């Protein structure tokens, strides 16, 4: 009996240490995530305001201005919705009903889909802008913005239809302990659908992601090839010993290439982790890490786009 009393505190102490470590990690993730959300909301608000003022004052706009302004609006709304959802992830309210859960999660997933569609179309548009006059893409320059806008609208409606299964599967977390539900927030969970329905919707989402990412990869590869060809031609004309200056259009393209590459990696990471959570792992800590990582693009992108705007750069340098 004495041996039992002597050794029994050890598992309890270990459990308390693990629990304290988990709470500490959760608290750190909460502070980091809300800081990320705050920075992203500020950056996208500033970028959106810049494009609105640019339009009101009648400045000459580029073909990419409308998609970039639309992307900043989408990211602003997405981060605002995510900030509201995150309060129920990191702060245990458990006060949402089915309607609130369905509305917020579905709206967030639609905005995520719009972000993917707009980013992909922006990559294609930049490839069209950069294409030389002799290219077969040159004929799309005049009507490219109209085509891109129609494509974004079509893909958005298509994704809203595909994502409508969330209106059925998202429910308020019941007051019972079960491993069948997939964690979303403290108040909301995903009710697993039948194997056939889950496979069908997952296949449609994978097809959509593969199609849009393939467009981004192809347009990125095309832009890299054009930049390399232009650089070789410039070096041949000016001499290899001289380093040719990069034009503003090329600098903007190079910046966009880095941003697109990062976005593709984040999308692939999100897809892999989401599938693993659905099939194998339902761990809230890994889920919190996932939502932090996948929002880096929405947080960083407005500052990257602003770095290519000469008016903003000159204004900041004069301060």
UniProtKB/Swiss-Prot annotation:
Q: Name one GO molecular function term.
A: pheromone receptor activity
Q: Where are the transmembrane segments?
A: 32-52, 66-86, 110-130, 151-171, 204-224, 255-275, 286-306
Superkingdom field:
Eukaryota
Q: In which tissues is it expressed?
A: Expressed in a subset of sensory neurons located in the apical layer of the vomeronasal organ.
Which Pfam families does the entry link to?
Answer: V1R (PF03402)
| Compartments, record wording | Cell membrane
The membrane topology of this protein is: Multi-pass membrane protein
The residues exposed to the Extracellular compartment are 1-31, 87-109, 172-203, 276-285
Q: Where, in residue ranges, is this chain on the Cytoplasmic side?
A: 53-65, 131-150, 225-254, 307-319
GO terms (BP aspect): response to pheromone; sensory perception of chemical stimulus
* Knockout consequences: Mice lacking all but one V1ra and V1rb gene (12% of the V1r repertoire) show a lack of chemosensory response to a subset of known pheromonal ligands and changes in maternal aggression as well as male reproductive behavior.
Predominant localisation class: membrane
Q: Is Transmembrane helix tagged as a keyword? A: yes
Protein family membership: Belongs to the G-protein coupled receptor 1 family.
- Under what name is this protein listed? Vomeronasal type-1 receptor 51
| Organism phylogeny | Eukaryota, Metazoa, Chordata, Craniata, Vertebrata
